[in-house]
Every structure is written in C-alpha cells, then in structure tokens.
C-alpha cells in the first residue's frame, strides 16, 4: 500500500476532471478558433469552462485568461504590472521573502531592469501582516504581490486585509493562489484582488493548465507572442481538454470545500499531534491559519533527503521542500525566511 502525502506538489486527477476531458478529446477535438461545427463545439466548451472558473472566483468570464499553469500566470501578472508602473514612473514592487520561485525569479529579472523590489520579512509563524504592507507602500509603488497561502509551510495570509490596503492606496494587488484555489474560499471582489494565479493540478485537475484572473481594465503584456487567442493576450491554440478538466475539478472542489476542509483538517491535526511527540521535532508555520492539508515539520539532526528515501521505502510519498526545487541541495528559502537554521 502506498500513502501519497505530497499533494502540495501535485494531486491525483479526479474522475470528475477525467470525465470532462474525454469528450473534449474524442468529440469536441476541433480548434476553437475554427469556424466549422467541430471547432465551434470546442469554442463552446471553452466558453463554458471560462464561465465555470469565473463563477468559482466571483468575476466575469472575460477576466479569465487560460495559461499553461501557475508559473506562466505569475510571470504575466508581474510583467504586466511592471509595464504599467514603468509608464507611470513607478518602479517600486513589494512582495515577501517566502514567495514561490515563479514570483521571486521574475522579481529578480525586474530588478535587473531597474525596478526596486522590497521583500517583506516573514514572522516566525510564516505570516505577513497587512500593516507591514501598508507601511511599505510608497508613492512610487506599482505592485504588491503576496501569496494566498504558502506552498511549503501552509500559512494562509490575510489576503482580504492586504487587498483592502492596496485598494485604498491605489496600488495593484496580485496574489499567487496556486495552493489556495479549490481549498480555500476565493472571492476576488470581496478580497480586493486585482490579479490572481491558479494551477489545475493542485486541486485534482490536469497538469499543464492554469488561469490568470485580471480585473477588467488592467492591460496585459503578452508573455507568448503569436496568434490572437485569449482575446490577444495569450497566443497559442487553447488546451481545451485540459481547460475543461481544470474547470470541472475547480467546480467540484468548490462545491465540496467545506466537507473536505473538516475531514482533512482533522487528519492534519491528528498527524501533527502524533509527529510532535517525536523528540527534537518542531512544526513549521502557523497552526491556526493553515491550509487544511499541510503538515510541515523539522527534525533536528535529520537529513531531509535520507528521511524521504526511508519513507518511500516504507510506502510513504512525501517531500522535504517544494517540488520545483527538489533537485537542489540548497536549504529551503521558506524555512530560512521564518528563521529556521540550516
């Protein structure tokens, strides 16, 4: 028997997602840009999927851009906000020290282009406050980008409060919601979110497909040049089967969110309680404001990779950091950000 405990890295695709994808592969296989009937059936499925995602986020369908995943969505959001800022002479960007590398590496690129990036320090419980954001905003701030929930330690950030600060100050607010979508309630209107990224494979949808919410009126920079797909904002024939699967998975996750939260949170707390009894162990991240399915601990004197191999031999699949850095021997930037020693 295998115990899969690596759902922050990716999730098993649900039957709901598979059932939505198969007709798109077998029947509605046309190019959605084609005018013939097969193409238009694909276009209709694309439209319905866009409406489904928009419903789950409480936005308009025209505000959803489909992408290849969360990293592309993050890149497009940040580069677009930077372009707006450059035109206005505002070259200051605020983020946090424990963002996903899709954010941090894009910010490094923007620094080389002349932007000043300010990474807010993270409290030892893995939290950043709205007050920190408010105190950091300047006259030349063009963007605040703060993740909805951390992918390693599971901390849930006060997104609504941060969004309210940004809206009051007139600063664009982007959140990487890759770990939150399908697991936490998202309402881009109530939470004052201008741009939001998500990825299908984090909530039992397919890999290689994601979405970017962009509030109406915000101009986007094209990260991929080519055709006029996605209203000219993301070139390339749309991955209709993947998009259909992602939309179905998100709708299903949102419909069962509360019952899943109660069940998974109970399992999480039971596991944390048991593992915390191991000598020289410590839980990372906030215990109250935490993703339902996240458990992250440090064991003093234990090398992470060796522990993972032993767990795998025992039939337990887990990770010692984010999947995007699994080939690196560098210490987790997230754990360093909250003050954990190497």
Give a label for each model feature.
Residues 1-342:
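Pyridoxal 5′-phosphate
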């Amino acid at each position: 028997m295998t115990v899969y405990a690596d759902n922050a890295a990716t999730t098993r695709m649900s039957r709901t997602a598979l059932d939505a994808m198969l007709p798109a592969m077998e029947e509605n296989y046309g190019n959605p840009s084609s005018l013939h009937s097969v193409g238009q059936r694909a276009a209709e499925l694309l439209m319905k999927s866009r409406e489904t995602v928009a419903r789950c986020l409480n936005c308009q369908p025209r505000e959803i851009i489909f992408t290849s995943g969360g990293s592309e969505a993050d890149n497009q959001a940040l580069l677009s906000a930077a372009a707006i800022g450059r035109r206005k002479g505002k070259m200051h960007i605020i983020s946090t020290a424990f963002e996903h590398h899709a954010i941090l590496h894009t910010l490094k690129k923007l620094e080389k282009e002349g932007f000043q990036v300010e990474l807010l320090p993270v409290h030892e419980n893995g939290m950043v406050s709205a007050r920190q954001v408010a105190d950091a905003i300047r006259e030349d701030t063009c963007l605040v980008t703060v993740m909805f929930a951390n992918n390693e330690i599971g901390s849930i950030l006060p997104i609504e409060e941060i969004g309210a600060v940004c809206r009051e100050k007139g600063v664009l607010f982007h959140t990487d919601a890759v770990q939150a979508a399908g697991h936490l309630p998202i309402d881009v209107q109530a939470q004052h979110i201008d741009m939001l990224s998500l990825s299908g494979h984090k909530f039992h949808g397919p890999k290689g497909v994601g979405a970017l919410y962009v509030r109406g009126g915000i101009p986007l920079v094209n990260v991929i040049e080519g055709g006029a797909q996605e209203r000219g904002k993301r070139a390339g024939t749309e991955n209709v089967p993947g998009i259909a699967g992602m939309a179905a998975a998100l709708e299903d996750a949102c419909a069962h969110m509360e019952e899943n939260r109660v069940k998974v949170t109970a399992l999480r707390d039971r596991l944390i309680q048991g593992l915390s009894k191991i000598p020289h162990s410590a839980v990372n991240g906030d215990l109250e404001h935490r993703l339902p399915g996240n458990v992250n601990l440090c064991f003093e004197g234990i090398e992470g990779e060796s522990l993972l191999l032993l767990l795998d031999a025992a039939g337990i699949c887990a990770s010692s950091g984010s999947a995007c850095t699994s080939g690196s021997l560098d210490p987790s930037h997230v754990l360093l950000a909250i003050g954990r020693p190497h």
